[in-house]
A protein has these predicted regions:
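Bacterial N-terminal signal peptides
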Residues: 10-12
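M14 metallocarboxypeptidase catalytic domain recognition
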Residues: 2-6, 16-535
């Protein structure tokens, strides 16, 4: 059977695989699809207004062998500048920072407000980026195709910009694109750096994102088209998409994302004869198990945890070189356009609901959700047979995270308090927009202290960190005293969810997991929970 009422769509990722890294040499092997498989993905025959299709002679030969993308940095910059020169509603910008190797990261504002300079307006704010991973060319090409479509249809552009303003970064990771690799130039994965915030480039782009303060966002990727289950099956979806699912996002925002937005994206994909399904990871191939992706540790969570609607777009493309590129770009464009169109068609409802939910989130006494698990069921899932190209409904064990089952909750504290010695923790929280107060008179009072009872050290380093996993704690009440300069993080703020997922040690991507706050069995966790009404 097919589940769509309770599932979202995106990419197939095989967990537990750690690739070896070399500087500027991390391309992936190209998969040469059998003709019977390729027949499932015909050219859509539509006009696309992005550089690879407007200027086909500019596409390098290396795109065909999977060692380059289709659009150079210079052409991307020229394309964006050209659009801005002929459209008063687009402003081309170069930030005051660069990539790790000094490449420009151009971005554009879209607004019909005269003299718009990126400051907040009373309209819906939308954020879009592509090419977080440099070997996923369908991402930035889809973003540029969206801009090109606006340029080519003045009536549509006017309708969209009457109700929304945009910040768009087509190419988040220009170093990765230059080497056609997933990673930053340093070998860090950009989409695994949103919690630990180890790279300056991540912090710089996040600062733009915090300042923009979007209500709706789209993060544009491609997923791997590799054989599965003893080289018998391939993923079948042109595009997979998923709303960011952390349970600490306001339930009304999650309901809107998983209801109206999801349904409209699915309808748009159907209208373009594109296959689609939820974004899943594959923790096991024997038996075949799929889990809906939870993006706490593996994606840009800025908008969702700031109480907004955030969608992940994944098109079938990694390892396919230039195969089906028009179809891949169309799939990505369709998802972007559907999110945008749904937002602007329902702008008043979306804006009001999100702003109201943000205000409620800052004042609620609801419990916080620290960990969750999927609702596991047996079902079938469509795959393509490598043997003959037919689509098969394959039995799978499916982990449904829409919504997930909560398995660890905790009362919302009045605040977290910790020593001024942990300035790095305060800095990383502030980078996400969380307000962190410095207590000039220090702190003395009763707190909830967490004693570490279980903490497992990973046997493999990930990006230089041997993570501490499976953390368990016991809580007790005690009095603590901190001198002047201690930090106070109130839970009465609408970005508090960023603090929850980082400061509660058991959370999947907490600072304790990343050893930003190192812990071992027997330690008292150095961040204390102040019970409500204690200040």
């Amino acid at each position: 059977m097919r589940l769509y009422q309770s599932i979202a769509t995106s990419s197939l990722v095989i967990s537990g695989v750690y690739a070896q890294s070399r500087y500027a040499a991390n391309t992936v092997p190209v998969y040469d699809e059998p003709e019977a498989v390729a027949a499932n993905f015909p050219n859509p025959g539509v006009e696309l207004y992005s550089p690879a299709f407007l200027f086909p002679d500019s596409v390098p030969d290396e795109f065909a062998n999977g060692t380059s993308g289709p659009t150079s940095q210079a052409l991307l910059e020229g394309f964006l500048q050209g659009l801005a020169d002929r459209n008063s509603w687009m402003t081309y910008n170069t930030p005051n920072f660069t990539s790790e190797e000094g490449r420009s990261i151009p971005y554009v504002w879209l607004s019909n407000t005269e003299g718009f300079n990126g400051t907040s307006s009373d309209k819906l704010r939308i954020y879009v980026h592509g090419a977080v991973h440099g070997n996923e060319p369908g991402g930035d090409q889809a973003v540029m195709a969206f801009l090109g479509k606006l340029d080519n249809n003045a009536t549509w552009a006017e309708e969209v910009l009457e109700r929304a303003d945009f910040l768009i970064i087509p190419r988040y990771n220009p170093d990765g694109v230059a080497y056609f690799q997933r990673y930053f130039a340093t070998g860090f994965d950009p989409n695994r750096d949103h919690v630990k915030l180890a790279r300056r480039q991540t912090l710089d782009i996040k600062a733009m994102n915090v300042a923009w303060d979007a209500h709706v966002s789209v993060d544009c990727h491609e997923y791997g088209a590799r054989p599965l289950v003893n080289n018998t099956l391939l993923s079948a979806q042109d595009g997979q998409f998923s709303a960011f699912k952390n349970m600490n996002t306001h339930p009304r925002i999650r309901a809107l994302a998983e209801g109206l937005f999801r349904d409209e994206i699915a309808a748009a994909m159907d209208a373009n004869n594109l296959t689609h399904g939820p974004y899943v990871v594959i923790p096991s191939q024997s038996p075949l198990r799929l889990n809906e992706f939870i993006t706490d540790n593996n994606g840009e969570d800025q908008i969702a945890l700031s109480q907004g609607i955030s969608y992940l777009s994944e098109t079938r493309g990694i390892g396919l070189a230039d195969s089906h590129f028009a179809r891949r770009t169309l799939a990505g464009l369709t998802i972007i356009e559907a999110v945008v169109q749904t937002a602007v068609d329902n702008a008043e409802e979306v804006l009001t609901l999100i702003e109201d939910a943000r205000a409620e989130y800052a004042t609620t006494d609801a419990e916080i959700i620290i960990t969750s698990m999927p609702n596991v069921t047996n079902m079938t899932w469509p795959f393509i047979s490598i043997a003959n190209g037919s689509t098969l409904e394959v039995p799978v064990i499916f982990g449904n995270n829409s919504p997930a089952i909560t398995n660890l909750t905790r009362p919302r504290p009045e605040a977290y308090v910790f020593s001024g010695a942990w300035s790095e923790v305060a800095s990383k929280l502030r980078a996400t927009g969380v307000e962190v107060e410095v207590l000039e008179d220090g702190f003395e009072g009763e707190v909830e202290a967490l004693n570490i009872t279980v903490a497992n050290l990973a046997t493999i380093k990930f990006e230089g960190v041997a993570q501490t996993t499976g953390i368990e704690t016991e809580m007790s009440l005690r009095n603590v005293t901190f001198p002047a300069g201690a930090y106070w993080v109130s839970s009465r703020q609408r970005r508090a969810a960023h603090a929850f997922v980082r400061l509660e040690p058991e959370a999947e991507s907490s600072f304790a997991v990343w050893n930003v706050l190192p812990v071992a069995v027997g330690d008292e966790y150095p961040v204390y929970r102040v019970p409500r009404k204690a200040k």
